[in-house]
């Protein structure tokens, strides 16, 4: 079971992934992987941080400014992604009932280790819920079920996706 969620920025992909993770944990399932949250300063987005779903470890994925690796205005910290995000996915492959990856996008795919572990997840039988940057839909749409989140359907999709996951985990 592989479920991918896409949608416009700010529509609630991360919120949906986190709500599903919390509900699954509440029901006793072991959830692994990570989510990515915005870092804001004075109401402006200045970066992104990764938070692991098993240990709540946090690290900065990207921040506005100069760096060796850039995506748009953000410097991407590949070492942080590799040491925290990739390791969380590896643990989840071994120990979790489901893997959640938020998100599959340009920043994350700057890391070779991230690309490799995502390939490993896709090839495995481990259930996956991943959010997809809209530019990456074509790469993943044939690898699982794709949902497009909108403001109008996000409550309905929460129930629908949660029920589909629960049916697959039984």
UniProtKB/Swiss-Prot annotation:
It comes from Methanocaldococcus jannaschii (strain ATCC 43067 / DSM 2661 / JAL-1 / JCM 10045 / NBRC 100440) (Methanococcus jannaschii). This is Nucleoside-triphosphatase THEP1. Belongs to the THEP1 NTPase family. SMART domains: AAA. It catalyses: a ribonucleoside 5'-triphosphate + H2O = a ribonucleoside 5'-diphosphate + phosphate + H(+). The keyword Nucleotide-binding applies. Keywords: ATP-binding, Hydrolase, Nucleotide-binding. PANTHER family: CANCER-RELATED NUCLEOSIDE-TRIPHOSPHATASE (PTHR43146:SF1). It holds the Pfam family NTPase_1. The keyword NADP does not apply. Its EC number is 3.6.1.15. One of its GO terms (molecular function) is ATP hydrolysis activity. Has nucleotide phosphatase activity towards ATP, GTP, CTP, TTP and UTP. May hydrolyze nucleoside diphosphates with lower efficiency. Disulfide bonds: none annotated. NCBIfam families: PRK13695.1. Signal peptide: none annotated. ATP binds at residues 7-14, 98-105.
């Amino acid at each position: 079971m592989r479920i991918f969620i896409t949608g416009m920025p700010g529509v609630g992909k991360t919120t949906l992934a986190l709500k599903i993770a919390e509900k699954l944990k509440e029901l006793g399932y072991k959830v692994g992987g990570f989510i990515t949250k915005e870092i804001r300063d004075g109401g402006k987005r200045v970066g992104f941080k990764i938070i692991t779903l098993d240990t709540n470890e946090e690290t900065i994925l990207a921040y506005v400014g100069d760096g060796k690796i850039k995506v748009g205005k953000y410097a991407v910290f590949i070492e942080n992604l590799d040491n925290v995000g990739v390791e969380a996915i590896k643990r989840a492959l071994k120990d979790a009932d489901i893997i959640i990856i938020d998100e599959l996008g340009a920043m994350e795919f700057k890391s070779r280790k991230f690309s490799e572990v995502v390939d490993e997840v896709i090839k495995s039988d481990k259930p996956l819920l991943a959010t997809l940057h809209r530019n990456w839909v074509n790469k993943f749409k044939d690898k699982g079920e794709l949902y497009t989140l909108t403001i109008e359907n996000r409550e309905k999709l929460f129930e629908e996706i949660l029920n589909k996951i629960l049916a697959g985990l039984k």
